[in-house]
UniProtKB/Swiss-Prot annotation:
Catalytic reaction annotation: (S)-4-amino-5-oxopentanoate = 5-aminolevulinate
Family membership noted in the UniProt record: Belongs to the class-III pyridoxal-phosphate-dependent aminotransferase family. HemL subfamily.
SUPFAM superfamilies: PLP-dependent transferases (SSF53383)
GO molecular function: glutamate-1-semialdehyde 2,1-aminomutase activity; pyridoxal phosphate binding; transaminase activity
Protein name: Glutamate-1-semialdehyde 2,1-aminomutase
Subunit structure: Homodimer.
Residues bearing the modification N6-(pyridoxal phosphate)lysine: 271
Recorded metabolic or biological pathway in which this protein acts: Porphyrin-containing compound metabolism; protoporphyrin-IX biosynthesis; 5-aminolevulinate from L-glutamyl-tRNA(Glu): step 2/2; Porphyrin-containing compound metabolism; chlorophyll biosynthesis
Amino acid sequence: MTDALNTKRSEEIFGAAKNLMPGGVSSPVRAFKSVEGDPIVFDRVKGPYAWDVDGNRYIDYVGSWGPAICGHAHPEVIAALQETLEKGTSFGAPCVLENQLAEMVIDAVPSVEMVRFVNSGTEACMAVLRLMRAFTGRDKVIKFEGCYHGHADMFLVKAGSGVATLGLPDSPGVPRSTTANTLTAPYNDLEAVKELFAENPDAISGVILEPVVGNAGFITPEPGFLEGLREVTQENGALLVFDEVMTGFRISYGGAQERFGVTPDLTTMGKVIGGGLPVGAYGGRKEIMSMVSPSGPMYQAGTLSGNPLAMTAGIKTLELLKQEGTYEKLEAITKKLLDGILTAAKESNIPIYGQSISAMFGFYLCEGPVRNFEEAKSSDTELFSKIHRLMLQKGVYLAPSAFEAGFTSLAHSEDDINATIKAFKEIFSEMS
């Protein structure tokens, strides 16, 4: 049997936090409500591991929700940050580090000719929506069910991430007028997109999507889907936007657009490009980006945008990722992990379906296949909650939601992967 976990100190801290912050957390999914438990309070992280305040160590497959692709607290990133810290934390003025990271992003990402740094993925998506409308002169936008583009009002329509996990159709406080111009379609359904364009001639500014959905579990694009979106947007004078906050520099150095060979007009980024510090960015064709203030009339600004610490961590992280063999290693360890999970479940007659690409993976507790959000919802969330609790007791930290992708890192070793597969085998055996 799996031993119980001592989380007394975590429980005390979370109990106090609930009187200080809504739900006791700074972001909803951290509260563990989706897995019917109380959260683990972390004390420190290093490499592929996280330690809680009770001294328990976990092999971490959340990775701070994506940024920690090189592993937590990578010594080269920490050293670079310490050097920059001596010069100050924020200038509120241009710094050469912005140029350096911008050049790296432009060199790597096929669609990006110019880039603007912000402080979060939500900010990037808010700005890119405004830019889509400013450039085209059209108000409507198409998004996909289960795709999450941050918590801005206009995107909280059939969204993924915490909204999917908690079963909330939308968020209270979002006026209908705000989302009236947000059209939705099922992911991987090109015909539905074509119908929306036919029903709204010359009114749609563009299509935004996670090219690989990581906020409704892990859903990959069907062959021809991304290519079809590129074609239909061009035919209708609309923009194609890839939200690569999660996939950027993770499923390949040039992101999903490099991996799948489809170049959008605009791209949003975050997570990895900040190396664990708050960051976001949006970029694209120079013709479009020239609309952004102060070059053009579309206003967007930020006090801490392009701050030297985030730029430093991003530069060093991308330097590490450019090293030979990086993505081959990530692909191999992630495939081994997922194959091990799927095999262990099937040996215990537990229905499961999963996929992986490079350093991202996900599984659903159903027969599959899962091609869209509606099919994802057939996953057994109660069973996932049980698996999550048991894996914590085995020293493995999975995302506390059945609808979030998992992340591997360069710091995960063969021993870590083997230990994780062994833990899955043991808990699946206990369940069967």
